[in-house]
Structure formats: C-alpha cells, structure tokens
A protein has these predicted regions:
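Conserved donor NDP-sugar-binding/catalytic core segment of glycosyltransferases
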Residues: 97-138
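Acidic helix N-cap motif at the loop->helix transition within catalytic regions
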Residues: 15-18, 43-51, 95
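A conserved acidic beta->alpha catalytic loop
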Residues: 38-47, 87
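Glycine-rich, basic loop-to-helix element that forms the pyrophosphate-binding segment
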Residues: 62-78, 88-91
Length: 324
C-alpha cells in the first residue's frame, strides 16, 4: 500500500464512469483511502460508484457544483501523505502510480507531473496537445525523472500561461499538506489549475517524469455557465505573475542571480503585450463581420504571434544563460 489518497470528483459523470472504474481497478488497492466528492448528480453517478467501486476506506461526500471548490473539499478529507485527483474519464496504470509516488519520495517533490496520452470519446488516440509538460520535457531534454529549479518552473509557467503547468491532474501526484496550504483558486473559471501553477511555481518543488502511463479524455466541459463566466472578470495571468514574483523575491524563492530583474521585466512586457493582443483579437472574432475581413483583426493577430515568439526567445535566454 502507498501513502496515497485518491479524490474522485464527480458531477453527472455517468457517461464516463464505466471507463473510469475500469481504469481504477488495477491499482486502487494501492491507495490508503478514496474520497468521492459528488456535486449533486442526478444521473445515477453516486449509485453506480457505490455499486462498482470497492475499497476498504471509501468515503462519499457532497459539495455544491464548482470544479476547484470540490477538489479542495475532497483534498481536505485526505490524511495520506500524497493525493491524486482521479478526474472522471482519465486513467493511469498501476506502474505509473507507483512511479509518481516513488519520484515524489526520492526527489522530495510537492508535485510530480507527467504527460498523458490523449484519447477521444471512442477511445482512439489523438495527437498531443501542446501542454507545458511537453515543453518542459522537450526543452530540457528530460530522459529520467528530475526536479525543476524554482526559476525553471517560473519560466515554463510564464511562457505557457494559457495552459496549466500541472497538465492533467490525473497524471500527477501532489503532496497533500502542500495542497491544503495552497488550495486551488476558485475565482478563475475553469482555469484554476493553470492559475494555481502561476501563483505557486517558485514555492513548491516540481518533479517531472518523462514516461507516459496515463490517458486524458478529450470531452466537453461540465462546468456551469456561471463558472465559465467568472473567468471573464478574473485577473489576467500577467497580473497574477507580477504579484507572485514580488512575493517570491521578498521570500528569497527567486533571487537576482537565478532570474535577473531585467530579464523578468522583458518577459512581463511581452506577456502583457501577448494578452493585450489576444484580448483585442478575441473581441474582433466576436464581431458580426468575419475577422478575416477586418484589417484590425489581422494586426492584432500578428501582434499576438510576435509576442508569443518573443516569449519563446526569452525562455531560451533564461534557461540556458551562463550563470555567474
């Protein structure tokens, strides 16, 4: 048995549960405890899990709808050293779970991330999404598990800020105490895990595993309209990162030697330019006139592309500069 708790968040998840339970069975006996957090399902989700999920320390709890609030509620129930968020439809192998926990222990990590294989609803393998974890593995040439330096985590989170550094939570393990100290934010719509990575990139210990042993199911979101809309009024990633960096420099998590202020300001300048251009282009696309016929839209699209290219250039400078 591993020092691992499992949180299974559900909300009218019945279409994905047969596949999900089938994926859990080969390794669930390794877990010390299992907590199902259901958000008032009306489609038989809880009944199905009660009938088909077996574990000596299985508990059911309920929480009002809200993706990350439900995650936090489930994590609060876990007493094991580590936790995996087994989101419905996503799977991981027995060997993979053991590997993630082993790396967390051996490298003293707060979170260990890995890249899943992407599948559609029919089970067919799909092309990779360009997630931050893939960028980390490719850019650093990761061939075996390694722990990221805090400045590396900050750079990858910054340059890939439109996605979550954690990738798929079902492909990772987290130190439970760390998630209780730094819960997922609930005011960023469906991007709470991405913003969590930005907020805490430098103050948690990240481990990276290059092997693949999990799957991520590509399916429509189950988020409520209110949850989706909350992102529209949330702070942007550049504002979140500026506030976080101020705190990291005060605490010493990031120093002038590891990430010079001038280089960071260049990154922030281009990140802000990227989000300004993205916001303008998104507005162009909402107009009745097709954006392709709008010269302003083309200019904003080019600005966005140029800003993204500059962020990639600065990423290479930051990662591979020669430290004094």
């Amino acid at each position: 048995m591993l020092p691992l708790g499992v949180v299974i968040p559900t909300k009218n998840s019945m279409p994905y549960l047969p596949r999900h339970v089938e994926g859990l069975r080969p390794w669930l006996d390794l877990a010390s405890e299992v907590v199902v957090v259901d958000s008032f399902s009306t489609d038989g989700t809880v009944d199905f899990l009660r009938a088909n999920l077996a574990h000596p320390h299985l508990r059911f709890t309920s929480h009002p709808p809200g993706l990350y609030a439900s995650w936090n509620h489930g994590i609060a129930q876990i007493t094991s050293r580590y936790v995996v968020l087994a989101t419905t439809g996503d799977t991981v192998t027995r060997e993979g779970i053991c590997r993630l926990v082993e790396v967390a222990e051996s490298l003293a990590c707060d979170v260990v991330i890995s890249n899943p294989t992407f599948c559609d609803l029919s089970g067919q393998i799909q092309p990779d999404l360009q997630w931050p974890i893939g960028d980390v593995i490719a850019m650093l040439g990761v061939k075996q598990p390694r722990r990221l330096h805090p400045f590396e985590a900050v750079i990858f989170a910054t340059v890939n800020s439109t996605d979550a550094l954690t990738g798929s939570s079902a492909s990772d393990v987290f130190r439970t105490e760390m998630l209780k100290r730094y819960p997922f934010p609930t005011d960023f719509g469906t991007s709470g895990d991405a913003m969590w990575g930005l907020m805490h990139a430098a103050e948690v210990a990240w481990g990276v595993v290059p092997e693949r042993f999990s799957t991520f199911l590509l399916h429509p979101t189950n988020a409520s309209i209110a949850e989706k809309r909350s992102f529209l009024t949330a702070r942007r990633a550049d504002a979140v990162l500026r506030a976080a960096m101020d705190a990291w420099r005060r605490s010493g998590a990031i120093t002038e030697q590891t990430l010079p202020r001038a280089l960071w300001e260049d990154l922030m300048t281009w990140l802000t330019a990227y989000y300004d251009a993205k916001a303008a282009f998104d507005q162009n696309r909402r107009n009745p006139v097709p954006w392709i016929l709008n010269p302003s839209a083309w200019r904003n699209r080019i600005r966005r592309k140029r800003s993204a290219a500059q962020l990639q250039r600065l990423k290479r400078v930051a990662l591979f500069r020669k430290w004094q």
